[in-house]
Every structure is written in C-alpha cells, then in structure tokens.
Amino acid sequence: MSFQQEVSKRRTFAIISHPDAGKTTITEKVLLFGNAIQKAGTVKGRGSNQHAKSDWMEMEKERGISVTTSVMQFPYNDCLVNLLDTPGHEDFSEDTYRTLTAVDSCLMVIDAAKGVEDRTRKLMEVTRLRDTPIVTFMNKLDRDVRDPMEVLDEVESELGMACAPISWPIGCGKEFKGVYHIHRDETILYESGHGHEIQEVRIIKGLDNPELDEAVGEDLASSVREELELVIGACPEFDHELFLAGELTPVYFGTALGNFGVDHMLDGLTRWAPAPQTRQANERDVEATEEKFSGFVFKIQANMDPKHRDRIAFMRIVSGTYDQGMKMNHVRTGKNVSISDAVTFMAGDRARAEKAYAGDIIGLHNHGTIQIGDTFTQGESLKFAGIPNFAPELFRRIRLRDPLKQKQLLKGLVQLSEEGAVQVFRPLQNNDLIVGAVGVLQFDVVVARLKAEYNVEAIYEGVNVATARWVECDDAKKLEEFKRKSQANLALDGGDNLSYIAPTMVNLNLASERFPEVQFRATREH
C-alpha cells in the first residue's frame, strides 16, 4: 500500500462526554467491534477482577474512572482507527484538553436521559477552537430517556451545532425495540443481554413493512412512523462539508451496555470523519502527506507499566513516516536523536513500533528530556501551535512526613508536573512547595503516585493562594522592577517559568494595574 493510501485510511479520534455518560463502556464496545478485545471487559465490575481495558492506574482500577488518556489502535472496515480515551472524571481536564489537540475528529457521547451536561459543554468549547468534526452517540436507550427531539434541540441550542439524525430510536427503557436507520431505510431490532458478544440482529427493510408492526406492535410502529415524518421534515439532512467544518453532527442512537448501535456509529465515523489533517505550526502549515516526518508531544505519562517503571511521551505524528531506528531532530533542544524503541498501544498492551504514519500516536521512552508541546522533525525547525497549559484553580501546600526525602519529593513533583497531572510552584522567598490543580481529585492522584512511584509519603496543608498566573514582560528593566517589588508573590513552576501567586483575585487585579507592562497569563502554550 502506498504512503498516501496508508495516511488516508487513518482515523484519529477521541471520545468526549460528561462523567458517567457511558464513555468507558463505549470505548470497550468500539474495541469489541474492532475485534481488538474478544470479550468486552465488564467495566467497573465491582468486586470482579475484570477491569476495563483502557483504565490502567491503580487508582482508576479502584474507582472505576478513566484517569489518564490511553491510546488504542484497531482496524475497522477499510480504515485504521486510533482511538484516544480521555479521562471522564470531572477533574481531569488539562490532560483531556490536550488530547483534543491530537485528534482529527471526536465522538460525543450523551446520556439520553440527561442531555447536554456541564463537562460536555466545556470539552466542546475546546473542540470549537479547532472546528473539530463531531459524531454524536445518544446512549442508554435501554433506560427511560428524555424525548429524543428535545435532546437534539438542546444540542443545537447549547452547543451550536445542527443535528442530522442517521438513526432513530423505537421506544426506550423496557420498551426499547431497536432503531430505524434513516439512510438505509431499515429497522434494526434490539435484543437485550448481549453485552459481551456481537449479536445477530434482525433487520426489517422499509418503514411501511408490515413485519415492523408484528415485531414491535402496531401502536409503537405507527407512532414511530409519525415521529419520523416529523424528524425528517424538521431536521437537516446530513451534509459532509458542514460536518467537516464542525457545524453539523450526525446523530446515532443506541445502548453501549447492550452492545447496540455502536457499529452503526463506527460505520459513519470511518466513512465520514477526516483522514489526518493539515496542522498549523508557527512557521507554516504542515500537510499530513508530506514525505518528511514531523510530530508533537501532547502528553507524558509516568509508570504506565509497573514492570517497566518508565515514562512515555505520547506523540501525534503530523506528517511523514516513523521507521524504527530513524534519526529525528528534537527542536527545543536542537539535538538529533535516534529513536529505535518507540511503542504503539493497544489498551494497555504495548508493542514495539516498526513503522507508523501521519495520524498515528506513538510512545517515546522519556528520561526527563521530553516536555509536553515538544516537536520532533527531520531537520526543519517547527513548533506546532495550540497545546495549552491552564492556570490551576485549586492550591495546597505539600509537606513531607520524612523531611530527609525533600529531593525525591521535588523530583516526583517536577516529573508529575511535566506530564500535566498537576502543577508545582516553588516560591522564591521560602522553601515551600505549592501544588496547583484544576480539580480536587488530582491532589489525591499526586499523593498516591508519590507513594507508589517515588516512595515518598506526603500530606497537604491549606495555603493562602487564590490563583496563579504566568508572568511575561518584554521590557527587561520593568520586569526587574516588578520582580523586586513583588518578590513575596513570585514563584517558579515545574519548568522554571516565572509565575505570580496571588492570595486573592483583588491582589492580582491590583498587581496588573500597578504594572501595566507585565502580562499575567492564565494559559501558557507549551
């Protein structure tokens, strides 16, 4: 197969949803249909030893939430799908936001009983920045749900996207009988209890087929016909160009737990979602089909494998081909490195990557030299734009139970901050270590990982910090004056960037009024 064909068959997407909308279950079922897992793991099987394939840290296993992003690759139809699983828990935002910079499309999972929820809104704001195409799956139809038309209206009004239903539910809850596939003009009947295998489904051709009345009952059949007349009249038809521009989403209905409807959605996603896209670098736009290799690191994860005790930098290949043993240029450091041990992923199982193409995600072993946002190329000096760092919203002082382990504590915190799990600030005037996070659960993760991975027992104390900002100033003289007068509020973050730590928002506002030449930034590009 030619290089162009290899690139054009790639589909790299992430799943976004509110916690508990069924994202991990969908991930499982997508892998099942991609034959990647023969038996879909019982997710959150309380007490059972089968943990979902994509949840791998101890804490995730205990809590049944996906804490870290993992990558899974599998073939489907004539495509090769790279699925990036993003944390579903409310806290894990930074990692999730960055993952969304590494994909070409997204699958939005909505709990049809609840509609559009808060976390979905936040994630959609991020996809909006890049006009990412979105495919929608309305989940949990085997439970009692809201009126589907109402939920579609909510997606349109709250997320600003037109909805084009591709399938439509027949009943819901105990009365859920299946879906009518609008494009294929056929009804696919649902049978419950097939969570772990792909079921043989019965298909009835045509909406006016009397077999439909026999299968679902006359009342339900006639109300579905009426509903569909309304739906087809009121909803826009699927338009591929609007979809690619992020303005319209195809909508599928089903139940991931009941293993139903996921394959219809995958058919649509592989057919319509874009192959690897052109990427903006600060210097120029880079086409996926360019021969020369380029890629950027969007995530670093420590200790993915208890057997290996290592850190992996996840890299999205933007253009060209990775070949085992090839030399590439690490743009930030200016060094040429030879990479012979990159890995590909299949839900926690890794394999050595011999070859990978634009659109693929590979893992590089990282011994502390690679940072989030780093670019690797075959010589050209490029920096890919738009990989964000967010100012944390919650702060704690971290203290050791054993003061002799200060060195290990600092090492652990800096490594955890490099992978984006948390941010660490070292005030210039004292030896405190302040940890900043976007959500409360991140604090628990840090203490658990410090203990498990660095053998450091740490505890938190409250600290008088309301917010932090990264400080920039083009005028060196003014910056020195600012540093002299604001010494008590200044700190260095994990990457030694100057930061301003404000005890109150009022304090921050006063500082920015007193020093108009200084910029206080709430986000920082890596």
Curated annotation (Swiss-Prot):
The gene is prfC. It is found in: Cytoplasm. GO terms for molecular function: GTP binding; GTPase activity; guanosine tetraphosphate binding; translation release factor activity, codon nonspecific; translation release factor activity, codon specific. GO terms for biological process: regulation of translational termination. Increases the formation of ribosomal termination complexes and stimulates activities of RF-1 and RF-2. It binds guanine nucleotides and has strong preference for UGA stop codons. It may interact directly with the ribosome. The stimulation of RF-1 and RF-2 is significantly reduced by GTP and GDP, but not by GMP. It comes from Vibrio atlanticus (strain LGP32) (Vibrio splendidus (strain Mel32)). Belongs to the TRAFAC class translation factor GTPase superfamily. Classic translation factor GTPase family. PrfC subfamily. Residues 8-277 form the tr-type G domain. GTP binds at residues 17-24, 85-89, 139-142. This is Peptide chain release factor 3. Keywords: Cytoplasm, GTP-binding, Nucleotide-binding, Protein biosynthesis. It comes from the Bacteria. Pfam families: EF-G_D2 (PF22042), GTP_EFTU (PF00009), RF3_C (PF16658). PROSITE patterns: G_TR_1, G_TR_2. Its main location: cytoplasm. The keyword Lipid biosynthesis does not apply. GO terms for cellular component: cytosol.
